[in-house]
């Protein structure tokens, strides 16, 4: 009787998982960062903090309401290609956020980010398990969820501090 075969995986085998964990970090930091910068954002677009807070509320509603329908609509698309498109749209939307000088432009860009977010998390879990090295799917999924946790614990506080110091 032979002992079970141990698979050894180098760094290269973990690159897709690390990439997904980083994407989870960026998506979650992006989602929650405006909470800490709300007064700065409101001042920059010359709106009240309460009205500007709608960029957070509407974001949450868009994600909540569109996650299931958009997941169904994109179910037949190849996941890696879909993820790449989501990241491109996510990045472009953030460039619009960066240059938004009115509430309407900011809200429109945040809605686009929320749409990408609504699909991102629905495909992330199965994709994380699929790209992890053989036999390490649970660890791969945990690593991706770890990216989300690190966003909450480090990304948002550090991003808020930097945004308050140098401008959002």
Residue ranges and their predicted role:
Residues 16-49, 67-70:
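Extracytoplasmic
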Residues 28, 32, 98, 114-122:
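Small-residue-rich segments within alpha-helical transmembrane domains of MFS-like 12-TM solute carriers
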Residues 65-104:
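Conserved MFS/SLC helix-loop-helix module at the cytosolic interface between two early adjacent transmembrane helices
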Residues 103, 109-147:
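Cytoplasmic helix-loop-helix junction between adjacent transmembrane helices
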Residues 103-105, 135, 143-168:
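Helix-loop-helix hairpin linking two adjacent transmembrane segments in secondary transporters
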